Amino acid sequence: MRLGGEPESSNFEDRTGQSSSGFGGMGGGNALGCLLPLVMSRFGLGGVVLLVVGYFVLNSLGGLGGTGGILPSDKPQSATAGQSTLSPEIRRLLTVVLGDTEEYWGKALGNYRPTTMVAYTGGTQTACGFGQAAAGPFYCPNDQKIYIDPDFFNELARRFQAPGDFAMAYVIAHEVGHHIQNLQGMLDRAHQAQARASRTEGNAIQVRVELQADCYAGVWAKNAKTSAGQPLLESGDFEEGMRAAEAIGDDTLQKQSQGVVVPDSFTHGSSAQRMAALRRGYDTGNPAACTF
């Protein structure tokens, strides 16, 4: 990616190096909880990556609920300040990519209000409860912020064999896609539909939410430009994103973790669906094409 010399977003918080504790973390039965323990048991700690994002997004709005999860807490939460552990290279990638999404979506949507990205290590306070790195990157609609533990990118490269700067940019753009859905009321509508749906139907709704976010990521990638007007992506970059989308498909992860594929349990889409959604956005370059 052509990141050198590009402007950085100021909508960025560096909480890396802080020691945080949340007493409302894992609990049970609360309607605001996500299905994090269930997903962990299926895919393993540190192996959830983008899968949990959909759970957290919808359930922080009071969606599916479940056996427990990251819950809002009225008990004290604390953070001890420490020296940042964020490398200059990763910080620049995060802020430049975020800045370019602001540039594109600001023009495409007109009244776009940028999200803020928070980099943290281990765990951090959010308006959706206490966020933990095991959940992978996530978007909290209550504070309209994206949360990323930078160690996730090492996991993406090593465990899922999806290295590269655009693989990382795809993750960021996917979360920005959830922010757009929130601004446009799509998450609220999905939540309302889930409240009337069966578990299987609710999963299908969630898949459509995630595929749309993938498509939005592709739309941004197609339109991303440097300050000089060149495409931000270089040769081979888009393929990095496609490899990442393939690696985190529900069917691929289920095969790896449990040896069988259960389509009714999909919450983010198969590898083929995720790749097709990213490709649709990239090929059309048009947000209107991202209807699922």
Give residue ranges: language-model regions.
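Pan-zinc metallopeptidase signature
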Residues: 248-292
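Active-site recognition of the HExxH zinc-binding catalytic motif
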Residues: 105, 148, 167-183, 213-214, ...
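Catalytic Zn2+-binding segment of zinc metalloproteases
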Residues: 176-191, 225
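Long amphipathic alpha-helical segments used for membrane anchoring, targeting, substrate engagement
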Residues: 1-81
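Short pre-active-site segment immediately N-terminal to the catalytic Zn-binding motif
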Residues: 152-170, 201-207
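Catalytic zinc-binding patch centered on the HExxH motif and its immediate surroundings
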Residues: 123-149
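Short helix/loop segments within enzyme catalytic domains
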Residues: 88, 92-117, 204, 208-253
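Post-HExxH zinc-binding segment in Zn-dependent metallohydrolases
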Residues: 1-22, 199-228
